[in-house]
Amino acid sequence: MHKDEDQRLLGPAPLPNDPDRSLRPQVLDDFIGQEAARANLKIFIEAAKTRQEALDHVLFVGPPGLGKTTLSQIMAKELGVNFRSTSGPVIAKAGDLAALLTNLEERDVLFIDEIHRLNPAIEEILYPAMEDYQLDLIIGEGPAARSVKIDLAKFTLVAATTRLGLLTTPLRDRFGIPIRLNFYTIEELEYIVQRNARLFAVKISDDGAHEIARRARGTPRIAGRLLRRVCDFALVKQAKQIDRKIADEALSRLEVDHLGLDPLDRRYLLLIAETFLGGPVGIETIAAALSEPRDAIEDIVEPYLLQQGFIQRTARGRILTEKAWSHLGLAAPASTSIQKRTQLSDAQDNVSLQTTLWDGEDD
């Protein structure tokens, strides 16, 4: 991920000074939002405890910052077992994975974040570990090489990914409990902001909490980060409490608008609007023009813009919606509807194709 993207105020990736570690709920009943996922996890955990067996392997899917790591830690606590954590890119060789797995005790939870970035060779070793609780390792090289099987404790693998499509089918099929996490509602985020403010011993009004929540991009981690920054403004201004005026002033100075868009989001929208007349435009072109990696655009910027209805993905590329033009305060082109622009683009392609065919006949 791009360095600048990593440090965005509204980036969902955790920052070193984020307050959310100390604010994380410790049990499922304290976890706010994700009602369906939480209810199902309660049942699965209770069933595993009743049977005195390891919980089936769990796969969390969803944008960053929605609570995948927190839910994994809560699961381990609810099960009364140890929790080990790592991430896909960190497991560089077979020995790294073997060291992790052989140190697990019965029913322990192993959390692997960004599992879609796991080395394919490591993934092959993970298959028998997940299915048969065995490690198949090759010791030595050449004619002297031999296969060694190591029995493992029955553990639970909890994995998280932001890009389900990058997981191979064999790996995806080995997870007995797939769970999708969605963006939070403003009401849920408002409750989280008020809860965090109490833990910070900071007074906040309902409209102040609402103002922070509606700019938090549906992400609890970002809500906590924005609350901390607004607290800084309130402290310096010697405000008795955080109200809507204080929150609006602080967040406006941080260039976070009323829908939670930051400068990178606006650059993205303006690029499509001004340079490409609203689209369609391909993701590679957008990434190159913004000097950002394609992965950062697809994983960090676009999910929220899609969820808010600012853009649409088509077979021909990204297209701005009426809502995006309105938010930017720009007049849309005459043929502004997505259908009209797509049809126009297809018609242009057909003309180009026919011209090429006629040129070929002339030759």
From Swiss-Prot:
Protein name as catalogued: Holliday junction branch migration complex subunit RuvB
According to the record, the residues making up region (Disordered) are 1-23
Sequence positions that bind DNA = R294, R313, R318
- Its gene name is ruvB
Q: Write down the chemical reaction(s) this protein catalyses.
A: ATP + H2O = ADP + phosphate + H(+)
Q: Which UniProt keywords apply?
A: ATP-binding, Cytoplasm, DNA damage, DNA recombination, DNA repair, DNA-binding, Hydrolase, Nucleotide-binding
Q: Which family does it belong to?
A: Belongs to the RuvB family.
Q: Where is this region: Small ATPAse domain (RuvB-S)?
A: 185-255
Lineage, top-rank taxon, reads Bacteria
Q: What class of enzyme is it?
A: hydrolase
Where, subcellularly, is it found? Cytoplasm
- Biological-process GO terms, alphabetical: DNA recombination; DNA repair
The UniProt comment on domains reads: Has 3 domains, the large (RuvB-L) and small ATPase (RuvB-S) domains and the C-terminal head (RuvB-H) domain. The head domain binds DNA, while the ATPase domains jointly bind ATP, ADP or are empty depending on the state of the subunit in the translocation cycle. During a single DNA translocation step the structure of each domain remains the same, but their relative positions change.
Q: What does this protein do?
A: The RuvA-RuvB-RuvC complex processes Holliday junction (HJ) DNA during genetic recombination and DNA repair, while the RuvA-RuvB complex plays an important role in the rescue of blocked DNA replication forks via replication fork reversal (RFR). RuvA specifically binds to HJ cruciform DNA, conferring on it an open structure. The RuvB hexamer acts as an ATP-dependent pump, pulling dsDNA into and through the RuvAB complex. RuvB forms 2 homohexamers on either side of HJ DNA bound by 1 or 2 RuvA tetramers; 4 subunits per hexamer contact DNA at a time.
A matching Pfam family? RuvB_C
Region spans: Head domain (RuvB-H): 258-363
